[in-house]
Amino acid sequence: MGPPNSRFLWTDIIGDTIWQWTPGVGKQVLIHPSSHANGMTFDRDGRLVVAGWSARTIWRVEKDGSLVTIASRYQGKKFNSPNDIVVRSDGSVYWTDSAGGLVIPGMVGEDLQRQLDIQAVFRLTPQGEVKLTVEDTVYPNGLCFSPDESILYVNDTRLGLIRAFDVNADGSVCNGRVLHTLTGTEAGVADGMKCDQEGNVYCTGPGGIHVMDANGALIGRLRIPGHATNLAWGDDDWRSLYVTTYHFVFRTRTKIPGVPVW
């Protein structure tokens, strides 16, 4: 992502590090250890909000640089391993919670014990309540809102599909339906996902980035060498699309800008 001050941030999950790249400076460690940080985004106050895989929490970087846990349990039980994350304009934080992080090297003892019998989508309300939002998922991963936030998109790595949900005024969702099923035999799975300002959905998948319109029709693919893991728009005009793979970061310019995160 391209936050203020022209920095690009990305996570190295196995390396347990959040990195930053700044023009004229280059690559630097931002946070280490990072609780094997996975997905991250910014809230409307410009604070970095992070899905902590090994910490099994959602945490935030305050303006003074301190790290604060904002969600850690649902009904008294630890989350599995928060995967990806998005913030709604009212301040609600939504994230996917799958069990992949329970096998990260270096996790020991109680941290390996799964306490929830579901892999789901949760949200933290502006009032600080954790709400179960989508529970009929197999392995939820990427998620994003449509530009007007009327639809929440959630993909499922195991099933290889993207679902769409209507968002109610209170932040709950309804009317879940399959938007698109990813196809292909090349490297890549349903993982990171974002929307552009015209409502098209960009999702990692076999061979790179699959682009669908709001009706689920495939309108194009962006070929990426290697296994694409996540993506984010950045730069001042939000027309630069950054894509991570297991070992590299790629950048391309797009005709349609992405949805800003602040």
Stretches found by the model and what they are:
Residues 13, 53, 98-99, 157, ...:
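Short loop/turn segments immediately following the C-termini of beta-strands
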Residues 25-31, 68-75, 129-135, 175-183, ...:
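A short beta-strand motif characteristic of beta-propeller blades
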Residues 1-8, 33-52, 57, 75-93, ...:
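Beta-rich, blade/repeat-based domains predominating
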Residues 164-172, 254-261:
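Short loop/turn segments immediately following beta-strands, especially the blade-tip
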Residues 4-32:
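Beta-propeller domains
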Residues 95-116, 254:
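Short, conserved, GDST-rich strand-edge loop motifs in beta-rich repeat architectures
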Residues 17-19, 57-59, 119-122, 161-163, ...:
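A short loop-to-beta-strand structural motif that recurs across blades of beta-propeller domains
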Residues 15, 55, 115-118, 159, ...:
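A detector of repeated loop/turn-to-beta-strand junctions in beta-rich toroidal repeat architectures
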